[in-house]
Amino acid sequence: GQHGVPLIVDAAAEEDLQCYYQAGADLVIYSGAKAIEGPTSGLVIGRHHYVEWVKRQTNGIGRAMKVGKEGILGLTQAIENYLTQPKISGAQMVEKMTPFIEQLNSLNGVTARVVWDAAGRDIARAEIKFDEAAIQQRTGDLVQALKNGDVAIYFRGYKANEGIIEADVRSVSADQLHTIFTRIQALLNGEKNA
């Protein structure tokens, strides 16, 4: 910038790997494990001399982690896939999750609907709201049971204390959504080992 202070953008789960750099950011940091769907890792894009500063931290005191060849190869492959595979649109996400939402809405004490990404990205998710009095369970306990089943199922649980969870359907097939529905249905019916 005009004062010689580098602009660093923590883009975390953003989907566009170029827009912030092209808009003038000096360094842009992305999570390798979120939208890119790679291993636990990160990706830094930016001006050469600032990236060199980041690389020096490899030998620094208190570095966060030692990167192994498996992580590098995993992230490299994930980025390659991310840049070459067709992206699913929000409308396609809605189409995929509509039967899932309809099935969930047939369950007593469950209300499901499509919600759009709060940051304005073209991402639709399934929001599932549980009436805890009707289902006679805490949402947090249900989320834990879903994680601990034969098929581990994880949700966005930022609002679990309000009885709300979200399903991100980008990497999930229609068949997998049906499996998730049957697990929720079984747990609501009191089957502990569903």
Predicted segments, located by residue:
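Flexible, glycine/charged-enriched surface loops at secondary-structure junctions
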Residues: 14, 66, 85-93, 107-116, ...
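N-terminal, charge-rich interaction modules
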Residues: 91-102
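Generic C-terminal helix-cap and adjacent flexible tail
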Residues: 186-194
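Conserved PLP-enzyme active-site core in the AAT-like
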Residues: 1-83, 101-105, 113, 136, ...
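Glycine-rich phosphate/diphosphate-binding loops and the adjacent beta-loop-alpha structural elements
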Residues: 81-88, 165-170
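Conserved C-terminal alpha-helix-loop-beta "cap" of PLP-dependent enzymes
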Residues: 103-185
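A general structural signal for well-ordered secondary-structure junctions
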Residues: 26, 60, 110, 152-153, ...
